[in-house]
């Protein structure tokens, strides 16, 4: 019985020693992240869609901060994100790059024609936000609440059963453009 307690104590002491060494090393050799990259990454929409030409939002933020990449390449974020980044970096706003120049693009969502889906899982592997569910050789479907409309699942599909369709506007999804609605003050009469 003493041998078991000695072994437990030895392993515990080793774990404590290695933990202390790793803790010291993580603080001693820590690499400071660029605070500008952190702030830009917080502004970006985190859709990880790759439409900017980078594999995700963090690499795009690093390219903006370190390599002087254009600030206008985030299609999902649109003009609002570009303006926030321009303000943060104190640079001139730029017109949106490429297809993102539409002022109010309709939100798109991937739709799978489930009758033609062969269950190859290529779309699941391509989706950066895990919005597609299904199993091998079984029907797949898209969870529209999670889909960012990034278009990355369309090309890998061998049966071409995936398409992007605009999301229908409902009272729940309607966004009022309060800057274009004419507003006037109506005087109120007080009656005694």
Swiss-Prot record:
GO terms for molecular function: 4 iron, 4 sulfur cluster binding; electron transfer activity; metal ion binding. It holds the Pfam family Fer4_21. GO terms for biological process: electron transport chain. Keywords: 4Fe-4S, Cell inner membrane, Cell membrane, Electron transport, Iron, Iron-sulfur, Membrane, Metal-binding, Repeat, Translocase, Transport. [4Fe-4S] cluster 3 binds at residues 127, 147, 150, 153. It is found in: Cell inner membrane. GO terms for cellular component: plasma membrane. Residues 1-26 are annotated as: Hydrophobic. [4Fe-4S] cluster 2 binds at residues 117, 120, 123, 157. Belongs to the 4Fe4S bacterial-type ferredoxin family. RnfB subfamily. Part of a membrane-bound complex that couples electron transfer with translocation of ions across the membrane. Required to maintain the reduced state of SoxR. HAMAP family: RsxB_RnfB. This is Ion-translocating oxidoreductase complex subunit B. It comes from Escherichia coli O81 (strain ED1a). The lineage of its organism: Bacteria, Pseudomonadati, Pseudomonadota, Gammaproteobacteria, Enterobacterales.
